[in-house]
Amino acid sequence: NILVILADDLGYSDLGCYGSEIHTPNLDKLAKQGVRFNHFYNTSRSCPTRASLLTGLYQHQAGIGRMTFDDHLPGYRGTLSRNAVTIAEVLKESGYATSMVGKWHIAETPLRKDQREWLAHHVYHETYSDLCHYPVNRGFDNHYGTIYGVVDYFDPFSLVEGEVPVKEVPDGYYITQALSDRAVKEVKEYAKDDKPFFMYLAYTAPHWPLHALPEDIEKYKDTYKVGWEAIRNARYERQKQLGIFPNMDNFLSDRQFKD
């Protein structure tokens, strides 16, 4: 079985296992029991990374060199190319059950003037991109999640079940928790069968608009109150104590920018 979990715009230093002030015990446990990278490259932005991850190709080869709108240039068409085979398509042909839960954002979804007004999904319900580019038509047996890249966490725009728009969400809905619950439910169902499964779990968090639950806001509201310079100095001192940097004052060059 294969489970791929993707966070959205998560910083390298935002995880506890890499020294963050934010508590991430479950991810830290995964890191401790698995492999942590200390040197790697990626494609920098959200949707190009998704295109590369799902196809094994450079983002331009996959058709998404920048974002999900058509720049009318090869490699910049804003939609996952039909010449780029997804891992879901390959595994499905190999006998795997395939599921996607979460954010797609590799089909052309043009910017609109009223974009900020329709972050909440209830503004309209229609096809958010050509259906042939939806996850269920690119190798996934099913998909619960969003097509667009930016959504309201409490009332997400472009939320779909397969090809069908989800017209309303219950009171208290929070997409991060909803995606987790859906993934857990599906994994439990897969466990009843001997057929191998591939799940791609792609969260919308922590991408803007940075919507958090009240209890999480309360927990961290003072964590960075002292400002980024104080946090930077504290991290640097900790790195010296751990022997990552030599314990000397002039090891780093002068900063380019000052407060």
Show which residues each predicted segment covers.
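Formylglycine-dependent sulfatase
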Residues: 1-259
